[in-house]
A protein has these predicted regions:
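Non-cofactor substrate-recognition interfaces
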Residues: 1-183
């Protein structure tokens, strides 16, 4: 169950991190039937491990875009797909990461090798541009985040919003049942 919305969810997680991710406030159960006694808001959330797969078996699977404000201008049908990356390990994290080919060298290389497009949109002159402008603000395509600086440090003193864009995005994802943990 999602710890924020209490709705049933299915999670894919590196096997050796199950104990870490589901340590505090969670309790392992043996069967799905044992989940029926869960009540929203309970201090202990039950979970069941349904099975396991190798990461390589997930390659090529597509997934839903978490913030569907814009699609890449080029080859959008090739976006949002599971691809391999030799820099992704369970020693340094979950073994599953979101790539941002527009903003990182490793991500750009692995995405290009797999044919995954960068998240670039056309500006009013037809140029391909990222969803964050050169001043560090979200572009108009970003809905309610349009015009906000990515980080509050970019605002003039006293002009920053109470909650930074990253915090507002995390809240939106939690409210939409899209997050199991926000670090």
């Amino acid at each position: 169950f999602n710890q924020y919305t209490y709705e049933p969810i299915t999670v894919i997680l590196a096997k050796n991190l199950v104990g870490y991710q589901f340590s505090k406030g969670f309790e392992a159960k043996e069967s799905i039937a044992e989940l029926s006694s869960y009540e929203a808001g309970s201090k202990v959330i039950p979970y069941v491990v349904l099975g396991s797969v190798q990461g390589k078996d997930l390659l090529g699977f597509s997934y839903e875009q978490l913030l569907p404000y814009a699609l890449p201008a080029e080859n959008p049908e090739k976006a949002f797909v599971v691809i391999p990356g030799d820099f992704v390990t369970t020693e340094d994290g979950t073994g599953i990461v979101h790539t941002a080919p527009t903003f990182g060298a490793d991500d750009a290389k692995v995405a290009a090798d797999a044919g995954v497009p960068a998240m670039l949109v056309h500006d009013d002159r037809g140029n391909l541009v990222p969803l964050v402008d050169l001043q560090g603000r979200f572009r108009p395509e970003m809905g309610e985040f349009a015009g906000m600086y990515v980080k509050n440090e970019y605002y003039n003193e006293g002009e920053e919003p109470e909650r930074s864009a990253d915090v507002q995005i995390a809240i939106k994802l939690k409210d939409g049942d899209e997050v199991i943990s926000a670090l």
